[in-house]
């Protein structure tokens, strides 16, 4: 992991010509953090934007549990990204999230089966495959989801902004 972080940071630095200091874990899989903590510290990567309040996935390939995040728009931490420590080395700026009704995911299935130009995704990336158990949980119970500019989730932006302001977070 140490070697991978170092090589990839160098490639990114060569491309952008500036200091690289931020990170987001693919698939939101930042836990257990001790697997990457030393590599990020060694390579001066201190800003993370992986966590989203309420996020939960316990599949064989993707694990994260963000059910107990600090009630803040940003925080510092050391070895646990869910523990607010004012003198922490790392700085977390969480992804905005909102709580969704299962009906949203049924509509998402409909839009996947019958695509339109209204909610197009950017780029050519492909989301990680979700387990059937994860999908089942989404369509039968309320769950948390990230807010995005991409695709159908862009419809959350106004609601997320309103909720953010209600919490008196003023660093939007």
Each predicted region: which residue ranges?
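Short coil/turn segments at beta-strand junctions that form active-site/ligand-binding loops
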Residues: 18-19, 169-171
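Active-site-adjacent pocket scaffolds in enzyme catalytic domains
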Residues: 25-170
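CE4/NodB-like, metal-dependent polysaccharide N-deacetylase domain
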Residues: 1-27, 83-85, 91-93
């Amino acid at each position: 992991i140490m070697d991978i972080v170092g090589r990839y940071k160098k490639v990114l630095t060569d491309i952008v010509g500036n200091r690289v200091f931020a990170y987001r874990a693919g698939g939101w899989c930042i836990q257990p953090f001790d697997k990457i903590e030393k590599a990020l510290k060694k390579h001066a990567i201190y800003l993370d934007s992986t966590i989203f309040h309420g996020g939960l996935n316990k599949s064989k390939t993707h694990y994260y549990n963000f059910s107990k995040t600090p009630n803040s728009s940003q925080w510092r931490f050391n070895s646990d990204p869910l523990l607010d420590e004012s003198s922490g080395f790392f700085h977390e700026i969480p992804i905005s999230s909102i709580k969704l009704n299962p009906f949203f995911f049924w509509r998402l299935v409909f839009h996947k089966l019958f695509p339109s130009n209204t909610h197009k995704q950017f780029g050519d990336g492909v989301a990680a495959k979700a387990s059937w158990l994860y999908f089942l949980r989404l369509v039968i119970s309320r769950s948390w989801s990230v807010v995005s500019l991409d695709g159908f989730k862009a419809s959350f932006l106004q609601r997320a902004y309103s909720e953010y302001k209600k919490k008196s977070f003023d660093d939007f």
